[in-house]
Amino acid sequence: MSVKQIAFGSKVGESLLNGVIKLANCVQVTLGPNGRNVLIEQSFGDPRVTKDGVTVAKHVELEDRYENLAAQLVKSVASKTADMVGDGTTTATVLARSIYSEAFKGTSAGMNSMELRAGIDHAVEIVVEKLKELSIPVKGDYQKISQVATVSANGDTEIGDMIAQAMEKVGSDGVITVEEAKSFKTELDVVPGMQFDRGYISPYFITRQDKGIAELERSYILLYDGKISSAQSLLPVLEKCAKESASLLIIAEDVEGEALRMLVVNKLRGVLKVAAVKSPGFGDRRKAMLGDIAVLTNGYVVSSEVGMRLEDVRIEDLGRADTIVIEKDNTTVIVNGPARSSVKERCDKIRSEIQEATSDYDKEKLQERLAKLSGGVAVIRVGGATEVELKERKDRVEDAMHATKAAVEEGIIPGGGTAFLRCVKPLEEVIKSAKVQERGRDFICGIDAVRKALSSPCYQIASNAGKEGGVVVAEVLKASDVNVGYDARHDQYVDMIKSGIIDPTKVARTALQNAGSVAGLLNTTEVIIAQVPEKEKPNMGGGMGGGMGGGMDF
């Protein structure tokens, strides 16, 4: 077992706070319409330029091991916020820094950290309820949807309009994906495709570590209605795909044992681009959904019920897809070109089954299948003059897309940190209440930490615009209209809703809840146990070189 470094007492809090501050200082410059770029050195390829908070956070590694632990913890919260709603990572980081900074002052003054944490949790609950009161529904209002997307894309109206058009074409519950274009132009296209709620069986199938996804281009698809555990049964189809230098997606009830090990080894060694996901649905519905995917991709379901064996699968039996994106919990299959007549026939068959269905549950599941098969996939192809510009623009499109979906779910609130400022007064009233006063100063200090932190997003947006943050916050707080806030782009105070400066309620709520959670955890941490860095062993030289690995691993 490796030796550990251990820290106790005041050193713990100071190190953790320094780590959080350093991370927040890197991320906060990207906040708002006047957010600045961050230039990131990469281990290979060109440097990366981005305004995406979670991308910046992912690249922060601090030299001090104790400080780095705090930074990693806040990074995980930023990533969790991104995973849940796709945006709000910078806001979550800034709020976490502010809440923890205020709470740390109380702990340093001898207050009970557990009571402080209880106060933080109580304040977060109150603010969440207030945000829900301020929220305005937007489902079906494509002008508001465009405004949400524009704000999240750092004010790029072209991106905002394109996402609104995509949502209008495939519906608010439809599938929208983002790809890199082969030209300078950014274009929208609706193509046949489907998304289902199953992700990769093993994280070793991931091809893009920065996004945590597996991407396959021009891929074959093997559809099997049982479990696959034998490596031998898969060998023939794998060899056929490798011979054609094609990638392969396996969709089966499960892939396990030696079959899974063989797939992972060959993927890691670069022998074959392959991934495996579990079949969507259960029982008869699983078979039906496999049939839907087969029709969409022009393949066949390999089934023992009709006498088919994996060993006998021909390349013609496999489905084909132009793009496959596999996330932790979802898989999207895209087939470019017009929908085939077989897809339309399958949709007609499902419609007739809906009419014949007697139970509401069966009708609902059939409606889901019909929507997945007939809705198609909206593909936004992002263009750029250089690879650096393309990646930066693609980051913004993905952020905007996720923020838009969040807005449809829970509505919108005044943007620019305005909604958080409208929650300051309710917290002040709570602090004055007899019930809270009875809990004592430690509990009140926790509530006050959140109250003070609520001004930090607006303060930072103003600072990034070259203004005095404290003055801007005071002006917004003075306004009697709850929708009035600071328009950093035009340097004026406006009705944020009417001006289209809006944030999804879900993004703000999630950012605050995650920030409050991590601040409470950090403030109740008394001991740090960290790895002692290993000393580099001297290079003795003169050793024999290793032999070349060879051959296929099938």
Swiss-Prot record:
GO terms for molecular function: ATP binding; ATP-dependent protein folding chaperone; isomerase activity; unfolded protein binding. It is an enzyme of class 5 (isomerase). Pfam families: Cpn60_TCP1. Its EC number is 5.6.1.7. The keyword Isomerase applies. GO terms for biological process: protein refolding. ATP binds at T30, L31, G32, P33, K51, D87, G88, T89, T90, T91, G416, D503. It is found in: Cytoplasm. Keywords: ATP-binding, Chaperone, Cytoplasm, Isomerase, Nucleotide-binding. It catalyses: ATP + H2O + a folded polypeptide = ADP + phosphate + an unfolded polypeptide. One of its GO terms (cellular component) is cytoplasm. Its main location: cytoplasm. Forms a cylinder of 14 subunits composed of two heptameric rings stacked back-to-back. Interacts with the co-chaperonin GroES. Together with its co-chaperonin GroES, plays an essential role in assisting protein folding. The GroEL-GroES system forms a nano-cage that allows encapsulation of the non-native substrate proteins and provides a physical environment optimized to promote and accelerate protein folding. Belongs to the chaperonin (HSP60) family. This is Chaperonin GroEL.
